[in-house]
Swiss-Prot record:
Keywords: Isoprene biosynthesis, Nucleotidyltransferase, Transferase. The record marks 20, 27 as: Transition state stabilizer. GO terms for molecular function: 2-C-methyl-D-erythritol 4-phosphate cytidylyltransferase activity. The lineage of its organism: Bacteria, Pseudomonadati, Pseudomonadota, Gammaproteobacteria, Alteromonadales. It comes from the Bacteria. It holds the Pfam family IspD. The record marks 156, 212 as: Positions MEP for the nucleophilic attack. InterPro entries: IspD, IspD/TarI, IspD/TarI_cytidylyltransf_bact, Nucleotide-diphossugar_trans. This is 2-C-methyl-D-erythritol 4-phosphate cytidylyltransferase. GO terms for biological process: isopentenyl diphosphate biosynthetic process, methylerythritol 4-phosphate pathway. The gene is ispD. PANTHER family: 2-C-METHYL-D-ERYTHRITOL 4-PHOSPHATE CYTIDYLYLTRANSFERASE, CHLOROPLASTIC (PTHR32125:SF4). It catalyses: 2-C-methyl-D-erythritol 4-phosphate + CTP + H(+) = 4-CDP-2-C-methyl-D-erythritol + diphosphate. Catalyzes the formation of 4-diphosphocytidyl-2-C-methyl-D-erythritol from CTP and 2-C-methyl-D-erythritol 4-phosphate (MEP). Its EC number is 2.7.7.60.
Length: 234
């Protein structure tokens, strides 16, 4: 890889309102130990030595981001996001210049570790098409009926929980996202856009504590994970 192809830009779609949290402010601005979720996530990305810069997609009426201590960080850029995650990611990709790798990470996953980022970056040698962090399914899986009863047990062999970051060549991801959205495809993450285009992303085994904060109980759990991580660092 040449220098420009080796450049890594982190993309953080943070334009959502997080309605499932039942909070008055977007979930990325809720606090864990006196820091917002978004602050914790951005700190993790900005301090990784192999990430050149971070682009954050914000809601057009966001009133909270400028209050973050790192909002003016020299490696941090912002764009106006869209109504859906894919629209926000595409806005960030349009902001990028040149040939690089796009590492897309959920704003509500503050428990990511530098070690997992290292593993994902290293996977480019094995998966030049791109890869995602993922965790093998360990629990018994059930498919349900519409009435809330069990329909059947699903074989968990070769099933993975998709996590983030997800790392792809930026130009390839941008092109596939644009085409998929134009065709009305249901794009739930970056890997699904690549799959839609016939690309099979690599799977990189990630830590199960890299949770996405979606419900109120997740705040406490994330705080425990982050506290344990800090204890281990000391």
């Amino acid at each position: 890889m040449n220098d420009s192809q080796d450049k890594i830009v982190a993309i953080v779609p943070a334009a959502g309102i997080g309605s499932r949290m039942g909070a008055e402010i977007p979930k990325q601005y809720l606090l864990i130990d006196e820091k917002t979720i978004l602050q914790l996530t951005l700190e993790l990305l900005l301090t990784h030595p192999k990430i050149d810069c971070v682009v954050v997609a914000l809601h057009p009426e966001d009133q909270f981001f400028k209050g973050l201590p790192l909002s003016s960080h020299h490696k941090l850029h912002t764009v106006v996001g869209g109504s859906e995650r894919a629209d926000s990611v595409l806005a960030c990709l349009n902001h990028l210049g040149g040939d690089c790798w796009a590492m897309v990470h959920d704003a509500a996953r503050p428990c990511l570790t530098h070690g997992d980022i290292d593993k994902l970056i290293a996977s480019r040698q094995r998966f030049p098409q791109g890869a995602i962090l993922a965790a093998p399914v360990r629990d018994t899986m059930k498919r349900g009926n519409a009435d809330g009863t069990v329909k059947e047990t699903v074989c968990r062999e070769r099933l993975w929980h998709a996590l983030t970051p997800q790392l792809f060549p930026a130009a390839l991801l941008k092109g596939n996202l644009e085409q998929a959205l134009a065709q009305g495809a249901n794009i739930t993450d970056e890997a699904s856009a690549m799959e839609w285009a016939g690309v099979s992303p690599g799977l990189v085994d990630g830590r199960v504590d890299n949770i996405k904060i979606t419900h109120p109980d997740d705040l406490l759990l994330a705080g425990l994970f982050l506290g344990n991580a800090h204890s281990l660092e000391r």
